[in-house]
A protein has these predicted regions:
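Charged, often glycine-rich, active-site loop that binds/positions anionic groups
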Residues: 79-92
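Short, basic/polar, glycine-containing "phosphate-handling" surface segments that engage DNA
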Residues: 1-40, 96-113, 117-270
Length: 270
């Protein structure tokens, strides 16, 4: 699991289990994805993008409960301007969106998220040798920024099959702030034909909970699971920052000041 500031790592480790969704059983989904994974590991390196989608990504989206529309590519100035997938909460909402294809505002306003797929294992962030990302159309992270801005959808999922990233349109640095899970770190270390350990199932749960359709559905208060985790994480980070400031002013600064006074008295005689 990796997070680049979209969610606080400490919050995920210590407070995510406090959410009621944590108690849901991920094992049926785990077993289904594991079967798909075994095939992908045998053949994925030979797949192109369309094959990766057909053989792995679309079956996984189905298991996650999504209804979706695969978008025909739309080009403007040599750039692709639409994401691969519009992700809907159910078939009824998806079917209601079909007549609005071509009217992006009406179409995407019905979507809960957008999805962008790449061929198996394709790097999701292209970088200079210096390690800094470059802004160009071929960079998947920056494509996701463009799609989120263009469609005005709140959430985006980017994946190459192996790695899954969740992006939010509401953060300040959309391209570099994401929640990432590497499925290889879960499924490549399972005992051959055996049951997963509790720790491995927990790691899978941290993927399943953030990418399934149900986690983007509003609760009776109008907020989804991913919204609540994002808000809880931000609140937690602010509280930690405030506590650190209090510690500096109440404990650290007096000690520094006391040390300075003692130095002047003993060393300078003032």
């Amino acid at each position: 699991m990796q997070t680049k500031t979209l969610f606080s790592r400490h919050y995920l480790e210590h407070h995510l289990p406090d959410h009621p969704q944590w108690d849901e059983d991920p094992r049926p989904a785990f077993d289904a994805v594991r079967e798909l994974w075994q095939k992908a590991r045998r053949h994925g390196d030979t797949w192109n993008e369309a094959q990766t989608e057909q053989e792995f990504i679309q079956p996984v989206l189905d298991l996650l409960g999504w209804s979706y529309v695969v978008q025909p590519e739309a080009h403007r100035g040599g750039r692709v301007t639409r994401p691969d997938y519009a992700l809907f909460p159910d078939d009824e909402t998806r079917d209601a969106a079909y007549p609005h294809q071509g009217d992006d505002e009406a179409f995407y306003s019905r979507a809960r998220a957008i999805g962008e797929a790449k061929y198996w294992g394709r790097p999701l962030s292209q970088k200079h040798a210096s390690g800094r990302e470059t802004w160009k159309p071929g960079n998947p992270s920056h494509q996701m920024v463009s799609y989120l801005v263009g469609t005005r959808v709140a959430w985006g999922i980017l994946t190459n099959g192996l790695i899954w990233r969740l992006y939010s349109r509401e953060v300040s640095s959309t391209a570099s702030e994401f929640y990432e899970v590497d499925l290889g770190l879960i499924f490549d270390f399972l005992p051959q034909g055996g049951a997963p350990t509790a720790a491995q199932l927990d790691q899978f749960r941290r993927w399943w909970l953030f990418f399934r359709r149900a986690s983007f559905a509003p609760d009776p208060q109008g907020k989804s699971f991913v919204q609540r985790v994002h808000e809880g994480s931000a609140t937690y980070a602010r509280e930690i920052s405030d506590k650190l400031k209090e510690l500096v002013y109440e404990e650290v600064m007096p000690e520094i000041a006391g040390g300075f006074v003692a130095y002047r008295y003993h060393e300078l005689g003032v």
